[in-house]
């Protein structure tokens, strides 16, 4: 058997995410975030004559999956799609797929992307500022940090990083780049630290975490892509089909919760004796409170601490 590519990635909420889809052995399923292929592999174990379509825009994820899922690929049980999941509907349509039985999302950055210092995601490892999930796109963290005006940086840091020192950090960046371009992750992390009061530096967690998150979200338009994709997924689902979404920070969770609430709520006009079928909510929430990782999982998978799983079921087209 071929050796797998170095793509160490502990799958979060593995069983919960797939099991709550109530997989039909002959169904059509989508893993919108292939990553390390953990969810795909487990979902495939539940299929007999069904088929799985797995999306990822990261080339390394695809190379890893070609090895990890080699048997299922040979049996034509899975199709790997190199694309941003915001093109979910059109990519599936090209393959003749217009309806699916279930879909899962594991949002956020895969561990290997953080671990590969050359990708420029980590504030702990020296690398050129990059943060592109799709290596073919032009916008990178370097352009955001060096070219965006002060006001745009403040907006991004506050909106996507929820950092109360957004103005101070943006000002420090603006001053530094007038002297020379800010080129590396450590250079940026040190700048962020220099903009913060001493008491902030003593708090738990890395002081650059929120700002790096904000820049990453901007570079990859993560929230915009997630919103577009989840909306498309709901439309693609067959009646009784399910959608599972794992989020890792409050912005992703709020977005998912808002979309699910919008599709699962009906404002019934007063005096209406019976609700017509076409006025029923499109979705039914399977869990009102998010599913969290078990104590057992938290012991071996640090990434699971912030993970939240929300699941919904399609009730009507």
From Swiss-Prot:
Cellular localization per UniProt: Cytoplasm
Swiss-Prot/TrEMBL keywords: Cytoplasm, Methyltransferase, rRNA processing, S-adenosyl-L-methionine, Transferase
Gene Ontology CC terms: cytoplasm
Enzyme's top EC category: transferase
SUPFAM superfamilies, alphabetized: Putative methyltransferase TM0872, insert domain, S-adenosyl-L-methionine-dependent methyltransferases
Source organism superkingdom: Bacteria
Sequence positions that bind S-adenosyl-L-methionine: 37-39, 56, 85, 106, 113
EC annotation from Swiss-Prot or TrEMBL: 2.1.1.199
GO function term, MF aspect, one: rRNA (cytosine-N4-)-methyltransferase activity
Chemical reaction(s) catalysed: cytidine(1402) in 16S rRNA + S-adenosyl-L-methionine = N(4)-methylcytidine(1402) in 16S rRNA + S-adenosyl-L-homocysteine + H(+)
GO terms classed as biological process: rRNA base methylation
Pfam assignment, any one: Methyltransf_5
Keyword S-adenosyl-L-methionine: yes
Entry function: Specifically methylates the N4 position of cytidine in position 1402 (C1402) of 16S rRNA.
UniProt family annotation: Belongs to the methyltransferase superfamily. RsmH family.
PANTHER family (UniProt xref): 12S RRNA N4-METHYLCYTIDINE METHYLTRANSFERASE, S-ADENOSYL-METHYLTRANSFERASE MRAW
Protein name, entry field: Ribosomal RNA small subunit methyltransferase H
Lineage: Bacteria, Bacillati, Bacillota, Bacilli, Lactobacillales
Primary gene name: rsmH
